Amino acid sequence: MTQKFEMADRFNPSAVEQALYQHWEESGYFKPSENENAPSYCIAIPPPNVTGSLHMGHAFQQTLMDTLIRFNRMEGHNTLWQAGTDHAGIATQMVVERKIAAEEGKTRHDYGREAFINKIWDWKAYSGGTISQQMRRLGNSIDWERERFTMDDGLSNAVKEVFVRLHEEGLIYRGKRLVNWDPKLHTAISDLEVENKESKGSLWHFRYPLANDAKTADGKDYLVVATTRPETMLGDTAVAVHPEDERYQSLIGKTVILPLANREIPIIADEYVDREFGTGVVKITPAHDFNDYEVGKRHNLPMVNVLTLNANIRDEAEIIGTDGKPLAGYEATIPADYRGLERFAARKKIVADFEALGLLDEIKPHDLKVPYGDRGGVPIEPMLTDQWYVSVKPLADVAIKAVEDGEIQFVPKQYENLYFSWMRDIQDWCISRQLWWGHRIPAWYDAEGNVYVARNEEEVRSKYNLDSAVELKQDEDVLDTWFSSGLWTFSTLGWPEQTKELKMFHPTDVLITGFDIIFFWVARMIMFTMHFVKDENGKPQVPFKTVYVTGLIRDEQGQKMSKSKGNVLDPIDMIDGISLEDLLEKRTGNMMQPQLAEKIAKATRKEFAEGIAAHGTDALRFTLAALASNGRDINWDMKRLEGYRNFCNKLWNASRFVLTNEKLDLSQGEIEFSLADRWIQSEFNRTVETFRNSLSQYRFDLCANAIYEFTWNQFCDWYLELTKPVFANGNAAQIRAASQTLVHVLEKLLRLAHPLIPFITEEIWQKVKGFVDITADSIMLQPFPQVEENCFDPEAEAEIEWLKEVIVAVRNIRAESNIAPSKGLDLLFRNLSAENAKILEKQTALLKAMAKLDNVQVLAANETAPLAVAKLVGNAELLVPMAGFINKEAELARLTKEIEKYQNEVKRIENKLSNEAFVAKAPEAVIAKEREKQAEYQSGLEKIQEQYKAIEAL
């Protein structure tokens, strides 16, 4: 077996990762087996933005997904990881708009709709593959031939189908309601795209004169109204007070004169009003504030829209009733002085005019949150516009029940409450966007403005009996991106066709996603899926059985990673490494706010003075898994990454040690398993059990810890060392047993670790497989290790644990007394239990070899020991005679520390047992255990004190 000598000194990830991945992909190993007799397992990846690039959050979530996918594939399941990308309407349109502005000095309007959309498709073709290539670098075992895009023909058909069916069911309608309006981008945006920024503003107190000689309780002929938005006051249709506010109760139902506009508006009572805010009187502007909009609906107030879509003051107010239709007979003229003014210029002028009229009572500083569009970067305006809506309440009820009944489980469970709180207070969903890039709304208008909804124009004409003379114009708007991504689990599997993939893989098994999109995406997927996908009995299908919610990956200081903070880490840089110069360019080039560049460069130079070293994909994946404690945000830690790169090197070196051992004997013949062989097999079996249990609970951190602990602390640090005496002095049967155990445990360990660290395990496994007579092509398709009940050996575990403690105690004595490792020592035991005496008898040779001992002796009960350094292992006293070795002062200093340690433990337990609350609440068994520990420490303390006296007397 000459191949065992062909293993490089070091593992070089960059030399093997991409070649291995290419081989896996070309061999079709990522495809489902389509074995109808095997259980199916499917994960649908949250589709990243098509023009985006991979960030640490993607790497984190995808590592966890790939671990589950690889594990289930090795379990023999028919496994599909469904991937794809999202067209990301507003984000993609903006990227391309910025690009043509920078390169050609043009806007999308210069191109026109069709040409601009073609420009986006070109951009998608150019940059759309970036993220897929980066995902390959992570080792993601995705069936790339099934990759989908939310604007593929198939998915577009599914979107139209859903829209038309919901419209036919009366669940989609068009109406004029208040939305988040971005005055720069000229589109409605979702709450998720609104960023509330802390701002130092003002609270203006204006006097609104009372009409018809009415007076307040304290004799004033006006009410003082507090507002943070003077510019919208021209659209006021009421002022409101709290119904129980005694100051104003007598005025409810009376009217005030709206200054500047000179129209009468009512004083209404509503519990929405906070009596403590300002003066306890607020203006109600239903067309320009979400809360006021709800108040307006309750009191049947007209909505007076005074802003254009650019957020300038209109020439004529638009007056709408609570039914969303134009309202006749309500006068609301906008004074000429304000027409056409930009909203903040209007604010200034209105405040100045109030002051000139003597109606400005006071201005107070006020901290407030101003909503900004996260893409347009300007304050959002609540705006009355015509939009398409989904009436989601009927869909939400079914989706709530699915979680209540446990058909869908959230991990961690506390996220169910967040889901319920959103879903039980759900509002109709605005699904139209005033963009060009996206799924065009399948609705057409005739010259009279009648609306026709169907899958295409041809269907409109046949469905509504319209001949070709009727001119039709398609709705200009596109659908909210979340509408199409809400269909993701079933549209990607071929719905509305009843495909074999849909039958085989739906519902999917688990969704791994961030908490921030539970409502925007997760809830909508549940609602849409359960409405449109039914099983053979007509029961609504869930999209997935489990939602595993991850935290955010933050930087080492706990800050959110963002381009503007300059603290973004690119997963590919963790894999390949990056120079400081390139990292600086990446973090400070093309910045939206160039003034931050110097600060970012300084922080980067401090943190990454040498740049970032290459760590390889496996080290990155292992780190991400090890940090994945349930649902918590993660502070990224470069030291952990280095530690896990060292772990990969340790695994490589251990494998090399095993496979290049010239004494390795895998021939047929008699075998005699040693205690160490039995122990390592039992330990491995426990590790498999821990890994499987942890993975079933989505505790990826515990899976990683189990592999790390076994590989580093048991296999490498102990078992490899325990085999050295066998290879040096064992008989043929013992050497065969050690050889078999080494190679078989290593091969199984590689299979166990493969889902987490696929590249290094495949690379080593290719070298190991010949030693264990496996001819298969890839570790990927090997069975995942099972828990083997007959491999548990508690006796071997207990015996080795005791021997390890003895060996460590002797090694510590050597280190503390500065005795060279090569120098043979004698070891004496006192107070040795019968059980441990038996172990010692059988394992003396092993103990001598491992602890470099010349002699091992058990002292009789009354036998005096020579001058010696002592350590305790349980109740047994270990004595190493020090004639010719000892440094009296150093030994006394060491014993003083030991005495302090034992005294502290005795004191700690005494305090615990004298704590009445502890004794009252703790179970009897716990108290008994503490008393037992107390006796052990007390006894140990006395022995060390005796030893101290003995050495002091020398």
UniProtKB/Swiss-Prot annotation:
Q: Does the keyword Phosphoprotein apply?
A: no
Q: What's one GO BP annotation on this UniProt entry? A: valyl-tRNA aminoacylation
Which Gene3D superfamilies does the record cross-reference, listed alphabetically? HUPs (3.40.50.620), Isoleucyl-tRNA Synthetase, Domain 1 (1.10.730.10), Valyl-tRNA synthetase, C-terminal domain (1.10.287.380), Valyl/Leucyl/Isoleucyl-tRNA synthetase, editing domain (3.90.740.10)
How does the entry describe the domains?
ValRS has two distinct active sites: one for aminoacylation and one for editing. The misactivated threonine is translocated from the active site to the editing site.
Report the family membership.
Answer: Belongs to the class-I aminoacyl-tRNA synthetase family. ValS type 1 subfamily.
What assembly does the database describe for this protein?
A: Monomer.
Q: What name has this protein been given in UniProt?
A: Valine--tRNA ligase
